[in-house]
């Protein structure tokens, strides 16, 4: 994954907005800022119907851009990060709406950011994703990536989920309840946190198993290391990747999950403080 950005030779920056939201005013402001540095802003086709700016499909946008801006919330950034892995391109998150854990600043602050950026004043962080291997009943394997989490939940709200977890063909644990969350460190502040899972530092090489409303008082979240692959078996359950892709577990004979070797390069302001963000979002201290 991209370790360095040649900030002195940036020619094109791609931009993707959250769907079904008009952000033309914000896009024009970003274009105006980038034009100062002789950088062309190019858009995903769906990002604006009105603006007269170059527009491309997502694959072509990644191919021609030096890096890509996600303009929206954490959800927009999450889906973009999975695609960024395919093209070894970095992503910058600018939020439009509520401040998330992943997007750092609003468009109103972009002028200051890019002034520093084009002087080399920025940082790159590379959180790891989850690899998900879904093997169907014909033996065909579908590989997917998850930036935040993989959630196994009951298909029928009236029933209880029964989820078995194996490691090297030996049963590792068994869960009865509403479901199970497999979260990355970056995703530890999302659904995992709501289910009383631990917060894990974003760049840690680990992942988390957190039961959802377990019917046993002894079931607790556990943090597992990179290289620890689990197999998950559950009948009549749904597997959801990053809240965006759903699969019926009955359609697969094997589902394996572990921390991927793949990471995504996220561009941040140089003064970004992860723990200050936690303090502000979670109201720690004064």
Swiss-Prot record:
Domain of life of the native organism: Bacteria
MF (Gene Ontology): ATP binding; metal ion binding; NAD binding; NAD+ kinase activity
Catalytic activity: NAD(+) + ATP = ADP + NADP(+) + H(+)
Active site: residue positions: 74
A GO CC term attached to the entry: cytoplasm
Subcellular location: Cytoplasm
Ligand binding (NAD(+)): 74-75, 148-149, 178, 186, 189-194, 244
Alphabetized InterPro entries for the sequence: ATP-NAD_kinase_N (IPR017438), ATP-NAD_kinase_PpnK-typ_C (IPR017437), NAD/diacylglycerol_kinase_sf (IPR016064), NADK (IPR002504)
Gene3D superfamilies assigned: Probable inorganic polyphosphate/atp-NAD kinase, domain 1, Probable inorganic polyphosphate/atp-NAD kinase, domain 2
Record flagged with keyword Cell division: no
Biological process according to GO: NAD metabolic process; NADP biosynthetic process
Cofactor(s) the protein requires to work: a divalent metal cation
Swiss-Prot/TrEMBL keywords: ATP-binding, Cytoplasm, Kinase, NAD, NADP, Nucleotide-binding, Transferase
Pfam family of the protein (one): NAD_kinase
EC number of the protein: 2.7.1.23
Enzyme class (EC, first level): transferase
PANTHER family: NAD KINASE
Function recorded in the entry: Involved in the regulation of the intracellular balance of NAD and NADP, and is a key enzyme in the biosynthesis of NADP. Catalyzes specifically the phosphorylation on 2'-hydroxyl of the adenosine moiety of NAD to yield NADP.
Family: Belongs to the NAD kinase family.
Name the UniProt record assigns to this protein: NAD kinase
Organism of derivation: Campylobacter jejuni (strain RM1221)
Gene name as annotated: nadK
